[in-house]
Amino acid sequence: MSTQAADKPAARTPGAVRAGPGEFLFDLGTVQKIMGGPAYSTAHGPCVEGDRMIVGLMRMKAGTGAEPHSHPNEQWVYVMEGTFQATIEGKTIEAKPGSVVYIPANAVHNGKATPEADVVFFTVKDASYGLHGIKKAD
């Protein structure tokens, strides 16, 4: 075992890859895919965590998405393919490729792919909490 593996902290998000000392490049095409929010979302894809940031390349199948939830960390969503419809603190938006969506910490929000096509997005969160959020109670 290398000293890098021994010095590598555990990921906060189950199944995510944790960057360790001397690791600078990650091929998201080969990183294990995880659920973006197992209790409330269909988003899935590879996720890598550093000391202060978490990144993920997520996909939601056409017409599927996330139920209302929140998380104590803020989030950015960069739409790469498809259309991402979201409601953030009661305001509904529609983000197309090239759009960046900001979700403040603790904001109740949901998001989904339109029925016409899958949505693919690159997401970034601060690593204070992990990738997964808290489903809003019914």
Give each language-model segment a name.
Residues 1-52, 136-138:
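A short, N-terminal "cap"/entry segment at the start of jelly-roll beta-barrel domains
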Residues 59-60, 71-86, 124:
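Short, conserved beta-strand element in jelly-roll/cupin
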Residues 76, 83-85, 92, 108, ...:
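Structural motif
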Residues 66-68, 86-87, 103, 109-115:
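Short beta-strand His + acidic residue motifs that chelate non-heme Fe in jelly-roll/DSBH
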